A protein has these predicted regions:
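Short coil/turn motifs at secondary-structure junctions
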Residues: 67-69, 86, 119
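Conserved beta-strand-loop-alpha-helix junction that forms the acyl-donor binding cleft
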Residues: 114-122
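GNAT-family acyltransferases
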Residues: 1-78, 139-149
Length: 149
């Protein structure tokens, strides 16, 4: 699934992408460390990866950043997600984002920022269907906020 998503698109960086299985394992360990705030590079914040399984197979994954720094306020926000190409258009992104929002509530994140390209109509619909309120547009990027209060 991670291979099918590719290196990234529409602003989502597939940090797990690799042709090398051992490198993939290392990336999984690195993502665990990131979720715990261990060995973070200065520009990074803790983030947790969540997987969406349907019928016993992974169809997508999302990243929940535990808080924002100045960079993430302009690029990326709290949440990023991707669905494998063959499973797009089936409502899985809406389900995954809803689950990520629930996890953000568990982490006591009161307001969630999501960004997507203005041209990414599918992602805009997913965000809006999960309560995203468009508050700004800058250089072709939409800034949505969701209140968890």
């Amino acid at each position: 699934m991670v291979q099918e998503i590719g290196k990234g698109e529409n602003g989502f960086t597939n940090s797990l992408y690799s042709d090398d299985f051992y490198l993939f394992q290392e990336k999984l360990l690195r993502n665990y460390e990131m979720s715990e705030g261990i060995n973070l590079k200065p520009q990074f914040v803790p983030q947790t990866i969540y997987w969406l399984y349907v019928g016993g197979k992974p169809v997508g994954y999302g990243k929940l950043r535990h808080y924002l720094n100045q960079h993430l306020l302009q690029h990326g926000g709290h949440i990023g997600y991707a669905i494998r190409p063959m499973d797009r258009g089936k409502g899985y992104a809406k389900i995954l984002l809803n689950k990520l929002i629930q996890e953000s509530i568990n982490k006591q994140i009161k307001q969630i920022l999501l960004t997507c390209y203005e041209s990414n109509e599918a992602s805009r619909k997913v965000i809006e269907s999960n309560g995203g309120e468009l508050r700004d547009k800058k250089e072709g990027v939409c800034f949505y906020w969701i209140n968890n209060i």
